[in-house]
Structure formats: structure tokens, C-alpha cells
Regions:
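Alpha-helical scaffold segments that mediate packing/assembly in large oligomeric complexes
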Residues: 88-171, 216, 224-226, 301-306
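Extended, compositionally biased alpha-helical segments that mediate assembly or anchoring
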Residues: 2-18, 225, 232-306
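Short alpha-helical segments and helix-capping/turn motifs at coil-helix boundaries
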Residues: 28-32, 165, 266-267
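Assembly/oligomerization interface modules of large self-assembling protein complexes
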Residues: 2-87, 107, 130-131
Length: 306
């Protein structure tokens, strides 16, 4: 069963872990929506449907032919390790904590750094070349070539239109997307286009008190890690720098769609006193990966310009 980080925090009796999870979730539309599957081992091997069997109409007492067997792609999402040490000098902690809890502040900042790194690799992660990362959306969907789940503005990119955004939404099957993930520039453009059409953007309050805009009833998630410098040639991406384009992702989350996988969940480990230094260490670590269960549950719009 997949469970969100927010629910995991509620089930934890560790106050420090709860605080770290809440820090990671706040201001992260990705982690607020993404659910995680707890696995055993160092990766998740799963089958993704490729070809369905066929069905036929039959006359009474007629022979039934054998349908071709369904075809699957067997894929493996290997866990990657993301984390960092939060080191606190004992002198500073003891003499400067009258104004602010120094240790809590450093742990909070380290947790934010872990969140930022996860959000970046959620989009741009690439497991090849010894990076120690998992594969992100850009690689899983493959924005470098034509595909049924890739909508392109064409050529070297073009100004975003609502018609193309609607086309992106229609690439996702089995219900509406749970999230439209885009850069701040793309969000501003969508807002301007909706206003120009005479409509308005509906807004709802989130779990953490923040306000989320909706397009066609779908929450818009703003990612500070989606670049507006993607480059296109012939309608498809050739790189993520040197251009003036951005990508927008339409995503469904959960088992059977886009999900995370983890072994042990997000962990906060009090390492304790450091040898040779008058400091204490807390380690935040996460054995995590991204799982793309079904191609039809996510899509991407590329070449979006202002």
C-alpha cells in the first residue's frame, strides 16, 4: 500500500522525525501529493503493461480462438540514497541557544536541503554515469523523442496556449491528473491566458495553509526546479540549458501511476558525539526512488515559452 509522507508523519511517534517530515512537506507540491510504497530490498521490480490481449464476438456454439498473450515490460527502479549530516558545535549550541534553538535550526535547514535535492532529481534525475541518482520524469517520459505522452509546441518552441495545455491533460487516461507541475513562469502564463479568456483561476487552501490554484479543477504545482532554459530542435528537447523553453507535467499519483518507493522511509538518525570534534551529529537519510507504473498516467508538454 502506498502512503504519503504526511500520513507517515501522523503514524510516527518520533517528534524529531515528525518535525523533519513537516519541514520537507511544506512548500513542496510534489511531496504533498506523491505517495510512497514501502519495499524490502534495494529496488522494486514491476511489470508495466505493453500489449493487451484481444477480445472477440462469438456466435452460439462457435469455436473460440486463442487470444494473443498480453505483453509486459519488466522494469526495475533501484533505490538511491539522498541525505546529509547536520553537525552542531556544542559550544555554539550551549552559548547561542538563548535566542534560537541552534540544533533545531540546523536540522531544519538540512531537511530543506534534502527536499530541494529530491525535487530537483524528481524532474532531472539520471541514474547513468555514476550519479547515484534515480531516474526523474524527464528521463522516464523521454522528452527527446516523439511519444504518445509527449505534447510539443513544435520546432524550437512556441508561446504556451490553453489548447495545448488541454491536449496535455487529455494524454492522461483513467481520470484527470492529480497535479499539473510547472515552473513559475509557466504558471504566470497560464494565469494570464485564463484571465484573457474572461475566466478566473479557482483557488483552494491546502493542508499547510497555502493557497493552490486550479486549472480545469486540477491543482497547479509550482516547482522552482523546472528550468525555463530547455532547448528544442525539431520539436523535441536536446538539452536543459541554452534555450528559452520549459516543460509542464500532468501527473497521476499512487500505485498504478507515478509513485515513490522507499525502504525504511525518511530516517533521522542521532549519530551523537563526533570523534575529534566538540560537536554532535544528526544524519538525515532517505533510501528512495521514483516508480513509473503506467505510461498513460503521466504526460509532458514541452517547448512552452512565455
Amino acid at each position: 500500500m502506498a502512503i504519503s509522507l504526511a500520513e507517515a508523519a501522523k503514524l510516527s511517534n518520533d517528534v524529531l522525525l515528525q518535525g523533519v517530515i513537516e519541514t520537507i512537506l511544506k512548500d513542496s507540491p510534489i511531496l504533498q501529493k506523491l505517495s510512497f510504497i514501502e519495499i524490502v530490498g534495494n529496488g522494486l521490480t514491476y511489470n508495466r503493461e505493453k500489449t493487451l490481449p484481444t477480445a472477440e464476438w462469438h456466435a452460439v456454439n462457435a469455436d473460440w480462438s486463442t487470444s494473443p498473450a498480453p505483453d509486459f515490460d519488466q522494469l526495475t527502479a533501484a533505490l538511491a540514497i539522498v541525505g546529509q549530516n547536520a553537525d552542531v558545535d556544542n559550544y555554539i549550541r550551549q552559548t547561542r541557544s538563548n535566542i534560537q534553538d541552534i540544533e533545531a535550526a540546523i536540522i531544519e535547514l538540512t531537511a530543506k536541503a534534502v527536499r530541494h535535492e529530491f525535487e530537483d532529481k524528481f524532474i532531472y534525475g539520471d541514474s547513468t554515469g555514476g550519479t547515484n541518482q534515480f531516474d526523474g520524469l524527464r528521463k522516464l517520459i523521454d522528452l527527446t523523442q516523439a511519444g504518445s505522452q509527449v505534447v510539443t509546441m513544435g520546432g524550437t518552441g512556441a508561446t504556451l496556449t490553453l489548447a495545448k495545455l488541454d491536449e496535455l491533460i487529455d494524454t492522461v487516461r483513467g481520470g484527470k491528473p492529480d497535479l499539473l507541475l510547472m515552473s513559475r513562469r509557466s504558471r504566470r502564463k497560464v494565469t494570464a491566458l485564463v484571465r484573457a479568456s474572461g475566466a478566473y483561476m479557482e483557488t483552494v487552501r491546502g493542508e499547510f495553509g497555502d493557497f493552490t490554484q486550479l486549472y480545469n479543477g486540477i491543482p497547479i504545482g509550482v516547482s522552482d526546479w523546472i528550468k525555463d532554459t530547455h532547448a528544442l530542435t525539431g520539436g523535441y528537447e536536446t538539452g536543459v540549458s541554452g534555450g528559452s523553453c520549459s516543460a509542464i507535467f500532468a501527473l497521476q499519483f499512487g500505485e498504478g501511476a507515478v509513485a515513490g518507493a522507499t525502504n525504511g522511509g525518511l530516517q533521522v538518525e542521532p549519530v551523537g558525539a563526533m570523534e575529534g570534534k566538540d560537536s554532535s551529529r544528526t544524519r538525515i537519510k532517505w533510501y528512495v526512488t521514483l516508480v513509473d507504473f503506467c505510461k498513460q498516467r503521466r504526460g509532458a508538454l514541452i517547448g512552452a515559452q512565455d
